[in-house]
Amino acid sequence: MNKLYLKYFKLLIIFTMIQILILNEVMFSAYINPFLYILLIIMLPLKTPKWFLLTYAFCCGFFIDLFSSSLGFHSTATVLIAFLKPSISKITIPHNILGENDEIITHKIGIKAYLTFAFILIFIHHLSLFLIEHLSFNFNILIKIISSSLISLIIILITQQFFYRNK
């Protein structure tokens, strides 16, 4: 498990840099803000200790907040999905197909289960993030939540296929 922790802290640095230096700087449209860093929370094994999952989620969100000047919005949304991840996995991921330290990837759980699991977490993240950020809800924010969630899912799938194509 210690190797896993070390791996994920290295990935945290890489994904934070990608998010800050590339994704936050590219203007997709007024309605699309993709967030790749939440892939780290999605991929963590189901048997990850809760203390690590929540602490790691806070660190992920904190670093994005720190470099984006976003006052804790990302930390809040990321800790929320980390907290909900075990419950959502029980509903969306078939039982007994993952080993104790298996990462949650399409090759392990299947594309249908992965899309369902990942989209629910991504949607909850974006919903909470944009509602907290805007402190209101209207049609434009709904479009922003849905479009950002879909684009984030596509970017996450592409990234995952790139990293795990040979496994």
Write out the residue ranges for each language-model feature.
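Terminal, non-globular segments
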Residues: 1-167
